[in-house]
């Protein structure tokens, strides 16, 4: 089963993936789709606040998006909250998150060097899909721990209850689905 939708002026068929017996989600994956990545970056930047210093996302599906947003905006640097601690990340900051797509606790890390750069700066948080808001909350916590300020929150798609949030900017709504592929009411 697939769900067809228009995203940043482009039609895409999202496969429906089982989360539980009565909940399916549309899988939006930008990996390998340069056309959608470029279009989404352009549309998000057109709606982005102008007063941010850095972009931040969580590993991994939003990395192509944030890279393209940095490229289009002329930003020389952006940050990716990593899902695992790496040896090249001394003095890291870390938070724990539970995401709908991973279905288990997951840690996110910023290196001490990245945290130092964020201190006193305004950070625009970017994600591919905001659903439960847990990944977003974890990135907000990392920014705050680093001494930065959240300048805004953006996503390509808002899924389920996230569509009602007033504190995020997104390009389109992504419904959640029943097992038969119909949209959940």
Residue ranges of model-derived segments:
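Active-site-facing substrate-recognition patch
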Residues: 1-52
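Conserved G/P- and acidic residue-centered "switch" motifs that form tight phosphate/ATP-binding loops
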Residues: 128, 133
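Gly/Ser/Thr-rich loops at beta-strand to alpha-helix junctions
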Residues: 59-65
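PRPP-dependent phosphoribosyltransferase catalytic core
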Residues: 2-4, 137-185
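Short Gly/Thr/Asp-enriched flexible loops that form oxyanion-binding sites at enzyme active sites
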Residues: 65-73, 140
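Short, glycine/charge-rich flexible loops or terminal/linker lids adjacent to PRPP-binding catalytic cores
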Residues: 77-123
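Short glycine-rich phosphate-binding loop at a beta-alpha junction
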Residues: 52-59
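Conserved acidic residues
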Residues: 53, 121, 151
């Amino acid at each position: 089963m697939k769900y067809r939708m228009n995203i940043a002026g482009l039609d895409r068929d999202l496969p429906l993936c089982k989360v539980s017996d009565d909940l399916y989600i549309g899988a939006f994956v930008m990996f390998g789709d340069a056309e959608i990545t470029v279009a989404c970056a352009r549309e998000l930047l057109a709606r982005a606040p102008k007063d941010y210093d850095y972009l931040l996302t969580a590993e991994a599906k939003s990395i192509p998006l944030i890279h393209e947003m940095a490229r289009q905006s002329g930003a020389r640097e952006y940050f990716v909250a990593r899902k695992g601690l790496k040896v090249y990340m001394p003095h890291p900051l870390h938070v724990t998150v539970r995401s709908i797509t991973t279905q288990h606790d997951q840690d996110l890390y910023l290196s001490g060097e990245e945290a130092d750069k964020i201190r006193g700066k305004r950070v625009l948080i970017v994600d591919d899909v905001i659903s439960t808001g847990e990944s977003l909350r974890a990135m907000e916590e990392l920014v705050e721990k680093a001494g930065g300020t959240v300048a805004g929150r953006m996503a390509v798609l808002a899924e389920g209850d996230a569509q009602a949030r007033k504190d995020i900017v997104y390009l389109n709504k992504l419904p959640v689905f029943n097992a038969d592929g119909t949209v959940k009411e």
